[in-house]
Amino acid sequence: MPIHLIAIDIDGTLLDSSYCLPEANRKAVVEAVRRGIEVALVTGRRFDFAKPIAAQLGCPLTMIVNNGALVKTADGVTRLRHLLDRETARFVLQSTPRFRNGTAVVFDRQRDNQVIYEHIDWEDPLRKGYL
């Protein structure tokens, strides 16, 4: 059975622990695309985080970002956008503050090129480098 799609997580899979793209991984992705296999980079992070990584690969890719809420091509064309509506987001934020201690709540306004976050503990090792 032929392979049609390879979906690759970025952090710790495509990139190494220093957030660098190993040459062997770059070559493998380029070879897969050359063979006609669609490659998708997948991350819970923002499109702006994934875009430079896609540029390093230098081949046409799909990017699944924002924990799957947004699917874009490497050049920024939106294929799918499924975000929380304003009312639901407001309800979640108002209902859960005691459960979100130290958790980042990010509002990503790409058209305005701004990121607004409620609180991020920058000393937490899981948060460093996230945005």
What are these regions (language model features)?
Residues 4, 18-35:
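Basic, amphipathic juxtamembrane/active-site segments
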Residues 4-18, 92:
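Asp-based phosphoryl-transfer active-site loop
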Residues 17-18, 50-52, 74-75, 115:
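Short glycine-/acidic-enriched loop or helix-start segments at secondary-structure transitions
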Residues 29-52, 67, 105-107:
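Substrate-recognition element of Asp-dependent hydrolases with the DxDx(T/V) motif
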Residues 69-131:
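HAD-like small-molecule phosphatases
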